[in-house]
Amino acid sequence: MITGYKPHELGIFNDKHPRIGIIKKALENRLRLLLDEGLEWVIISGQQGVESWSAEVVWTLKKEFPHLKYAVITPFLEQEKNWQDPKKEKYQTIIARADFVTSITKKPYEAPWQFIEKDKFIIQNTDGLLLIYDEENEGSPKYIKRLAEKFMESHDYSLLTINAYDLQMIAEEIQQQDW
């Protein structure tokens, strides 16, 4: 599974923000390493931000690695219902291009427990979590991180992170290439 921050948690308010390219490059680099180790499936829940950018990275990598697949496992039906139209359209594209789509609770939003159940289900049914997360900027990813760490106490599970330092290194690499 890949997850992390939502755009507003990173101060990103449009699709042209330069930080998105840095995040996508970091995801691509890590996914390439995982593909070399046998990665076949990427799982996301369709959230805006890191998860939607992950889907875009997978689309690019599929050209080179046609065996790579991705699934969207949402916490509830119609999660995009209250989103603005451009975000809904992007979400619909992510759903349409996915190799597998399902919803954990099979009903529209009722309460926050649906997010918790989605996180539990995905952690229990995947081999690892790739998380864009920085301890100094907690935000929403802290909950799934805690859940993964607890699961790791009794299961063979990988928690891989991309933190602020990793993103800074990517930004510097990109800057050097542009010189």
Curated annotation (Swiss-Prot):
It comes from the Bacteria. Pfam families: YpsA. SUPFAM superfamilies: MCP/YpsA-like. PANTHER family: UPF0398 PROTEIN SPR0331, UPF0398 PROTEIN YPSA. Belongs to the UPF0398 family. This is UPF0398 protein Bsph_0756. It comes from Lysinibacillus sphaericus (strain C3-41).
